Amino acid sequence: MMGDNEGRRTPLLNLGVQVSMRVLTIGAAMASMWVMITNREVASVYGIAFEAKYSYSSAFRYLVYAQIAVCAATLFTLVWACLAVRRRGLVFALFFFDLLTTLTAISAFSAAFAEGYVGKYGNKQAGWLPICGYVHGYCSRVTISLAMSFASFILLFILTVLTASAARHY
């Protein structure tokens, strides 16, 4: 009798964890995207004004577009996870979508992080100077966006592991 109860509670508990983590992932990805999109600062260097915007960097644009894709895919898999509780055959497809979404999230984070690193520390060999001393607020908001992006990746990674574990049992 106890085994029957556990069998019924596990999918529901797993569904609760899945839904909670997917909602948190969507929130983190949307926050990352919003902070990056609204990030803009104008600075003056030696009397010359220049503007720092996310759209001037292909890596930051990629991060924004990837976060949009992460939100859409996670919303899709949120519905899919609810269906997978009733139809066990859908679990592998859920794992596959989670894996693709996780890979998208980490690739976008990595590209944007590399760009942010160069912006903060420069690259002496290439002759690129750090710019964060001039646009400190811009760099701080990029850091916040990257932290939220990394949080969405971690949540997706955990979801992928949980889904892979569930797929193994079915």
UniProtKB/Swiss-Prot annotation:
Transmembrane segments: 17-37, 63-83, 89-109, 142-162
Alphabetical list of PANTHER family matching this protein: CASP-LIKE PROTEIN 1U1
Cytoplasmic topological segments: 1-16, 84-88, 163-170
Extracellular compartment residues: 38-62, 110-141
Localization in the cell: Cell membrane
Species, as recorded: Arabidopsis thaliana
Coiled-coil ranges from the UniProt annotation: none
InterPro entries referenced in this protein's UniProt entry, alphabetically: CASP/CASPL (IPR006459), CASP_dom (IPR006702), CASPL (IPR044173)
Pfam family, one: CASP_dom
Location (main, coarse): membrane
Entry comment describing in which tissues the protein is expressed: In flowers, expressed in the anther wall.
Keyword line: Cell membrane, Membrane, Transmembrane, Transmembrane helix
Name of the protein in question: CASP-like protein 1F1
